[in-house]
């Protein structure tokens, strides 16, 4: 399980680096959605299954609005991809800087695999976050409805703004 969490952590860092070196806003939105999914996967792996699901749904709704806006406002006929020379060079520079920072802070290159970082007990898939479900629906249910309604209206605002005068 720790190897899986380590793999998800590496994927999270790589997705953030993909966002930082995005050649086109479309790929930037895609990498943000992927990083949100990987981050919620880490939360689920650590036992927060309901929290990971709620965060993923709210984050995915917000990112769909942002992704729709960037796709509508910045459409290019031939967008740059991640295999272009400048993008690969920027990504290589970021990987090198990350390696230097890692070496300076930790004095050696140690991946940390095999250490017991968390006391997960029996390694349950379903964690203790189900205790907060009743509290979420009792006190925070209207906040979820309100947030969903705002995201729903934002989609229509983005579509109206990007419709243009055709």
Curated annotation (Swiss-Prot):
Keyword check for Lipoprotein: no
Catalytic activity, reaction form: a ubiquinone + NADH + 5 H(+)(in) = a ubiquinol + NAD(+) + 4 H(+)(out)
GO BP, one annotated term: mitochondrial electron transport, NADH to ubiquinone
PANTHER family documented for this protein: NADH UBIQUINONE OXIDOREDUCTASE SUBUNIT ND6, NADH-UBIQUINONE OXIDOREDUCTASE CHAIN 6
Quaternary structure and partners: Core subunit of respiratory chain NADH dehydrogenase (Complex I) which is composed of 45 different subunits.
Major subcellular site: mitochondrion
Topology in the lipid bilayer: Multi-pass membrane protein
Entry function: Core subunit of the mitochondrial membrane respiratory chain NADH dehydrogenase (Complex I) which catalyzes electron transfer from NADH through the respiratory chain, using ubiquinone as an electron acceptor. Essential for the catalytic activity and assembly of complex I.
Assigned GO CC terms: mitochondrial inner membrane
The protein's name: NADH-ubiquinone oxidoreductase chain 6
Bilayer-spanning residue ranges: 1-21, 26-46, 47-67, 86-106, 139-159
Enzyme class, UniProt record, top EC level: translocase
EC code: 7.1.1.2
Entry similarity comment: Belongs to the complex I subunit 6 family.
InterPro entries: ComplexI_Subunit6, NADH_UbQ/plastoQ_OxRdtase_su6, Nuo/plastoQ_OxRdtase_6_NuoJ
Keywords noted in UniProt: Electron transport, Membrane, Mitochondrion, Mitochondrion inner membrane, NAD, Respiratory chain, Translocase, Transmembrane, Transmembrane helix, Transport, Ubiquinone
């Amino acid at each position: 399980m720790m190897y899986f969490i380590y793999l998800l952590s590496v994927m999270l860092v790589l997705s953030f680096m993909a966002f930082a070196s995005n050649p086109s806003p479309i790929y930037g939105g895609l990498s943000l959605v992927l990083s949100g999914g990987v981050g919620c996967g880490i939360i689920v792996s650590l036992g927060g299954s309901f929290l990971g699901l709620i965060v993923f749904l709210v984050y995915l709704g917000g990112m769909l609005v942002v992704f729709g806006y960037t796709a509508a406002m910045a459409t290019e006929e031939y967008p740059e991809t991640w295999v272009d020379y400048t993008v690969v060079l920027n990504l290589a520079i970021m990987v090198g800087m990350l390696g230097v920072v890692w070496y300076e802070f930790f004095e050696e290159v140690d991946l940390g695999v095999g250490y017991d970082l968390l006391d997960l007990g029996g390694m349950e898939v379903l964690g203790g976050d189900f205790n907060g479900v009743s509290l979420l629906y009792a006190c925070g249910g209207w906040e979820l409805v309100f947030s969903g309604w705002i995201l729903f209206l934002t989609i229509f605002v983005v579509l109206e703004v990007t419709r243009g005068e055709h």
